[in-house]
């Protein structure tokens, strides 16, 4: 039974997901269905958490839109998004960046990781 589940899980995993971590800025191209039409909408923000493993792995992206914080959680291996673009790498020391919810303006800015 476990090998059957492993086979199904392996078949549903996506291979086009880039390696990203909390603190990174990503641009998620989400497929939005409105009535009988579908279009691609971009959701650009900072990854504040990544949790789970396998098929049930999720990540949460936070952005500020018109001075209102918006967070959206996506399954990593979901067909709902076209692609994930890695914009910048962030230099953080935490796995969960929930403290960004209380910060405003420049205080909520994350340092960019330098490539050495």
Swiss-Prot record:
Name the keywords, alphabetized.
Answer: Ribonucleoprotein, Ribosomal protein
One Gene Ontology cellular component term attached to this UniProt record is:
cytosolic large ribosomal subunit
For this protein, the record's PROSITE patterns field holds: RIBOSOMAL_L19 (PS01015)
Superkingdom assignment = Bacteria
User: A Gene Ontology biological process annotation?
Assistant: translation
Q: Which HAMAP family match?
A: Ribosomal_bL19 (MF_00402)
Q: What is this protein called?
A: Large ribosomal subunit protein bL19
Q: List the gene name.
A: rplS
